[in-house]
Amino acid sequence: MAKPRHYIFLLAALVVFFGCSGIRFSHLSPEAQDFHPQSMAIFDIGAGGYEEAREAVDRIVTDELTAKGWFQKVLSVQAVQGLFKENEVLRKASADYLAKFNAVNFSDPELSKKISEEARIDALLLVNIDYWYYTKEEGQNVAKVGLGMRMIEAKTGALIWKAMHHLSADYRFSKPELKSVATDVVKQMVGVMPH
């Protein structure tokens, strides 16, 4: 009887070990099961001190989401900002929503619904740049990029999915481009994103 327990324990340990080989953190809300957005806006990119990376990350995330073909419409941060110029109601609702979200980590359902109606989108994607630099780790030169993403159901303001991931690329002489490391990070994160 003791042998089957050992096998069960070993099997469970292997599942845990190999099951953790994806992105570093991903949390899916129960509502995600029934949420299948047709349109998404990359609503904000929090640069966290890495302003030079904001435009590149916007392009990389937009391109990856578009390439997946999961959504009929994907709006980049630049496209959303273009809508702000045309629509004062959307601009004000968005500014108020982001101020509240950033100040108290609260997704206001009324403001989110207003944004959904004005921009005609189903989901908001908020992106944070956590790392974007070259450094030395354990004596090795590395290019390091880390991102966080949160998907919000625009009509209700519900947090559907959040994830964090980072990758490091070792190098000796020639530095890898941070954009290419970021592309790998985004591909892995989008790969586990609900759709």
Where are these regions (language model features)?
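Short aromatic-hydrophobic micro-motifs that form the base-stacking/packing surface
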Residues: 125
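N-terminal segment of the mature soluble domain
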Residues: 48-120
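Generic short beta-strand segments
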Residues: 128-133
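Acidic/histidine-rich, surface-exposed loop or edge segments in extracytoplasmic proteins
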Residues: 36-48, 93-94
